[in-house]
Amino acid sequence: MKISYAAVLVLALPVSLVAQQPSGGPPANPVTAVFRARTMGLQRNLAQAFDSIPEAKFGYRPTPAQQTIGYIAQHLVSDNYLFCNQFGAMKPTLAPKDTATADSVKAKWPKDTLVAKLKASFTFCENAFAQLDDAKLADQVTLSFNGQSRQITRAGMVLGHALDMADHYSQIANYMRLNNILPPSALPRPARPSN
């Protein structure tokens, strides 16, 4: 039986290509990595959004029943600490005025104060994510809120945090559009360099 050189080449080529592929399995902590990447993107958009909204608009709300932009900023700060506090052993150190001042008062703080506190809470969350891995996602943690406590998995806290940030980014993006400001996610993306 005669084997043609073409047949040998067709059979050998895929084997040689597979051998050249870098070995390795899935990335370490793929679930945590996905949540971290999504959350960091939302943080970036939220920071850009609040940076681009003029201070005069921080009292804006579309209807009397809705939250002001300033209220949303301070609320995000509180939520970031609430969720990210449960990602591991690291806990935030907050000044008494940050924990004892009523939300309605914090909502009227100057823009630079609110944005600085928001960015500090983002940094805390980034550091909290660094101590988290997939093996810890099933751990039970105690969530205490408004005087009530309940058990929840760390995965629930990570998912809750991502959903909360997406919800508030959507809210701020709508407020921005109502004020003729383009939200960060709608801005043209820079051109990628061609190779």
Predicted regions and their residues:
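N-terminal secretory signal peptides that target proteins for export/translocation
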Residues: 1-2
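Bacterial N-terminal signal peptides
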Residues: 5-16
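Cleaved targeting-peptide boundary
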Residues: 20-28
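Short, contiguous alpha-helical
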Residues: 36-47, 59-100, 142-195
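Well-ordered alpha-helical scaffold segments within catalytic/enzyme domains
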Residues: 45, 49-50, 84, 124, ...
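Surface-exposed helix-capping loop/turn segments at secondary-structure junctions
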Residues: 52-60, 128-138, 177-184
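Acidic/histidine-rich alpha-helical segments that form the ligand environment
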Residues: 105-143, 151-167
